[in-house]
């Protein structure tokens, strides 16, 4: 969703230089970088689209991270997977196929445990869940506007944001 130049401006406002952080918008399955290019990789609100393949970390992401480097992931999720009985509140904004990109912590633990090239530092529900959703819903893009229907109907009680932190071996 994000323009790298908008992110660059934000990072500069936060006191980070272009040498410290590089905003990227690219196909995560074919990154245009040398192996071991990054000290850390941060994925915000996107890993759930491409990272559901248990081989993705080892095959597609970790090669670009220096040994000892960190992966920080923040993704929307579910407090408890309810795909077999989707609440009507969630269906106000998302189709069942779209909701298949949101899962609970146990699901992500099962995906991440297949990774051989990194150790898990933590997988947990973010404490800022309500703040993160509120920030998202304030955005004036078509996706955030559409998501408001479910959240206004109480869909937030089923959703969270999940943090995953890994260190490359």
Predicted regions and their residues:
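Class I SAM-dependent methyltransferase SAM/SAH-binding core
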Residues: 1-30
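A short glycine-rich, Lys/Arg-flanked "PGG" loop and its adjoining helix->strand segment in the class I
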Residues: 54-70
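A generic alpha-to-beta junction signature in SAM-dependent methyltransferases
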Residues: 15, 50, 64-65
């Amino acid at each position: 969703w994000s323009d790298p130049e908008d992110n660059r401006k934000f990072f500069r406002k936060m006191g980070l230089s272009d040498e410290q952080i590089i905003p990227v918008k690219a196909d995560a399955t074919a990154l245009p970088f040398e192996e071991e290019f990054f000290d850390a990789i941060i994925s915000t609100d996107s890993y759930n689209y491409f990272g559901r393949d248990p081989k993705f970390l080892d095959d597609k992401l970790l090669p670009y991270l220096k040994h000892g480097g960190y992966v920080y992931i923040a993704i929307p999720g579910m407090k408890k997977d309810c795909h077999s009985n989707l609440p009507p509140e969630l269906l106000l904004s998302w189709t069942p196929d779209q909701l298949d990109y949101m899962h609970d912590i146990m699901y992500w633990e099962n995906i991440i445990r297949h990774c051989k090239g990194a150790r898990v530092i933590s997988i947990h529900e973010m404490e800022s869940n309500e703040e993160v959703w509120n920030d998202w819903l304030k955005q004036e893009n078509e996706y955030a506007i559409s998501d408001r229907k479910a959240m206004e109907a109480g869909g937030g009680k089923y959703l969270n944001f999940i943090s995953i932190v890994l260190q490359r071996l």
